[in-house]
Amino acid sequence: MHPEASEPPVDSAAEPSLEESAGDHGDAGPGVRKEEINETKETCVGPCTTSCQSQQQPSGDNGSDGLFTHSRDDRDDRGPRMTKQFLQKLCKQHKLYVTPALNDTLYLHFKGFDRIENLEEYTGLRCLWLECNGIQRIENLQAQSELRCLFLQVNLLHKIENLEPLQKLDALNLSNNYIKTIENLSCLPVLNTLQMAHNRLETVADIEHLRECLQLCVLDLSHNSLSDPEILSVLETMPCLRVLNLMGNPVTKHIPNYRRTVTVRLKHLTYLDDRPVFPKDRACAEAWARGGYAAEKEERHQWESREHKKITDSLEALAMIKRRAEERKKARDRGETPLPESEKSIPTSPEAQEKPPKGETQQKMESFVKESFEAKDELFPEKPGEGEELSVVVGNRAVEDADLSGNLAHTQTPVVVTPEEVTSPVEATDGARTEDTEAIALETKEKLFIDDLPDLEDVDGTDVSVEDQTKDTGIRKIQAISSLSDDSDLELEELPLSVFEGTPISPTGALSHIFAVSKDPSEAARVPFADICMPTATTDLETQSQDPSTASSHPLIQELGEDELTEGESNQPLPPQSCASDPTLAQSSEGGDSQLPAATPLGDGAENEAQSSLYPEEPSTRIGLEDIEFGLD
């Protein structure tokens, strides 16, 4: 009915669309938005005005309350905080101590903190990393009195302040901040390194405070806005300045001959910008300051000539050392004793002999060479009798041991073994025994040392010590076996030492005859006891015909059981026995069997004669004894 009354709802319904359209267009400013809102307010007429105002008032109050609470939440939760729980969790993550005071390093970089707080319990910190955060102020570091390094680069700092508690601070990094003036650093008595790169420093007044930093050695002012060349007047008053970086500042272009000028004015500078200041560079810069480019060129030439001479002298000294070493080697080869270095004249090349020595340089070279040889002699002393070593002759070889042979010369006789004894291996009729003999002969060609000789318990039949050769006092046991009887047993016969008095003792020991080999390849060597029994048989026949009553009742070979043998050896030794004729052997010998002679008792003369005829044929018995011994094993 009334169109005016119907229009406000339409306009009010269209109001959000207007606001949305204004919000969608980013170019539309707040003035446009306010005009649209005012237009919509003007459209509210009649009875709807009060209703609209009543609706807008509570909505405005709610909006202000919501904005206040939202700003308060932003202030409280706008980023991570350095809470105690967070710090403990961080220490656990980095495998640090859970007890705060025990930690000396704390890594708080790249965490997004906007302020420094809750570090009161971390009193033992020596290094604190706070780089790459949003910190706007240096504060709350009163408990860190032991701090040495503080890293605050890449933050939002505008001022240097609150560093008085850090009396032991050595390195401070404030790069990539918004600091315009260097200040409040004189309270740090041991500050050694200050990094102020990428800040807002511009004038000499901004760095004037550096005059009070007496212990500062490393200063980085790169990539600032310093343009006044008078900054050098401030820098040259710093007594300990060694490293300076001014790269990225306009002042490097405003100072003529920048590097030479800075090097000359800063007397103790050792590193400028991106490279060191060498002594040669400083000397050339000072020469340039005195006489320009010509003086600099002359000074550079002198330095180059000195460096070249130094290299040449070192090469000559090395050549002299090599030459003297060759002379000493030749003198040793000729058998001459080389003179000590102090008595020697300086052997040089013909060119050096023609030229006189060059004073101090030559003396330095000589002293260097002498010191080199003295050091070599101390490390590797030469023995005067290095090539003269006493040796113990074994066949055609020598057992070389200088130290032992000198001590053994007074206590024992030298071990001398004839080549026949060394090369007399065990031989046999079969081919396998010959191969073993050749192998043994090859093994004996190796050098033998006294330390390699076995102990007395390890002596074989072929390896006998000196005591076995010189001392042979025990009662020998002779094992006699008939080689023609298949069922012959081991016989043990003990003879006194007086029986063997006339027999020469083999130098290889009492048991060496067991392993000795006969050199006669005839058939007689294959029957061990045939040659022994032949002379004894003839002597038996003669003695029987002369004195038949002297025949002994004891057999030639006495058979002993194992029990009797052990009892006899344990209780008392068997008495000496004389040979008697065996009936079986006698009958076989009378029947014309020359291989089985009979034995008869021998008198003193017959005994000596039999013994003298017995031992020349020992090699034939040794084979049989060896075979029986191996057979018993």
UniProtKB/Swiss-Prot annotation:
Ranges annotated as biased composition (Basic and acidic residues): 22-42, 70-80, 326-344, 352-364
PANTHER family per record: DYNEIN AXONEMAL ASSEMBLY FACTOR 1, PROTEIN PHOSPHATASE 1 REGULATORY SUBUNIT SDS22-RELATED
Residues modified to Phosphothreonine: 462
UniProt protein name: Dynein axonemal assembly factor 1
Gene name of the encoded protein: Dnaaf1
Sequence positions bearing Phosphoserine: 349, 465, 488
Keyword Phosphoprotein: yes
Biased composition (Low complexity): 46-60, 413-427
GO biological process: axonemal dynein complex assembly; axoneme assembly; cilium assembly; cilium movement; determination of digestive tract left/right asymmetry; determination of liver left/right asymmetry; determination of pancreatic left/right asymmetry; heart looping
Biological role: Cilium-specific protein required for the stability of the ciliary architecture. Plays a role in cytoplasmic preassembly of dynein arms. Involved in regulation of microtubule-based cilia and actin-based brush border microvilli.
Keywords linked to the UniProt accession: Cell projection, Cilium, Leucine-rich repeat, Phosphoprotein, Repeat
Residues annotated as domain LRRCT: 249-288
A Gene Ontology molecular function term of the record: dynein complex binding
Annotated source species: Rattus norvegicus (Rat)
Ranges of the LRR repeats in the UniProt entry: 101-123, 124-145, 146-167, 168-189, 190-211, 215-236
Subcellular location: Cell projection, Cilium
